[in-house]
Amino acid sequence: MNGPSSRPAAIEMATASRFASLALSHVTREFPNKLDHVLNGPDDAKRPRALHPVFYGSMDWHSNVHGYWLLATLLRVAPGLPERDRIRALFDGQITAAGVAGEVAYLDQPNRGTFERPYGWAWLLMLAAELRRHGTDDGRRWTAALAPLTDAFVARFTTFLPRAAYPIRAGTHFNTAFALALASEYAHVASDEPLAELVGRMEAAWYGEDAGCQAWEPGGDDFLSPALIEAECMGRVLEHPVWRAWMDRFLPRLVDRQPETLFAPVSVSDRSDGKIAHLDGLNLSRAWCWRSIAARWSPDDPRRAIALEAAERHLAASLPYVAGDYAGEHWLATYALLAVLSP
């Protein structure tokens, strides 16, 4: 598995501390909040913390989950992090058996089978994978506490994927390739062979014959590149020679820096607009994907240098803007960290 956090990684302490401080400022900030919530009756009209005793902050549930992923990752890759004691105290206070039971109880109510599908599902599994990587008493304790929720989303993936006739190729939360990439990472770390086999089978069925990608992007509120996340996703389940042959068909003109749109960082006209601010996320997620893709080509392949150059341009375009307005501040550092830690 070739995910960015599957290997030891280096990050400058100042950057790690900046990202940690950002996440700590919002993971327990309850408001403003955009709920993904079906009311089954009048008694379901409750504040976020009553609905989600663990993941109630960061504007929305999925951003809160990956805010915890960011903090858990920094705790592992930056051992001298100044914020480490605050992070441990946060996890001890929030990732508890009682809190997780409340999250599972929410899922078990009627009309909530599609809650956070597939984006929030995938990020919860990424958090679970990261906690497993710690190999510490803390990590084992948090992994055990989170396990019922982890198991619930593994079960949802296992039930849903065989029923899904088509992938979703949008550049937003619904993108299937992104969810499969993160689910694949969890399956690898947790040695969940049934999930790994299912993810690989769905990727082959949905993307294996794709060729001549036109890359009709960006969309106005994209934060993922449908083209690049598909390439990144396929690299997780195909052996390198097979993946390279697939890439020759999928994006045959990369050596000529085509499609041109994949090499041009997007502009962001209004960072106070939550949808337009997604475009900073697109630059950061493209940087992550380009770096991950580059690592799968041999050092003498000219596409490796081309991909790394594209990654640096995209990272430089949006890294300065992970803070400044809460529209982006509640989530962008996660994608910056993915990019920074990718080889």
Identify what each model region corresponds to.
Residues 26, 30-43, 60-91:
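Alpha-helical solenoid scaffolds in large eukaryotic transport, assembly, and signaling factors
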Residues 65, 74-187:
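Extended ligand-binding groove/face enriched in aromatic
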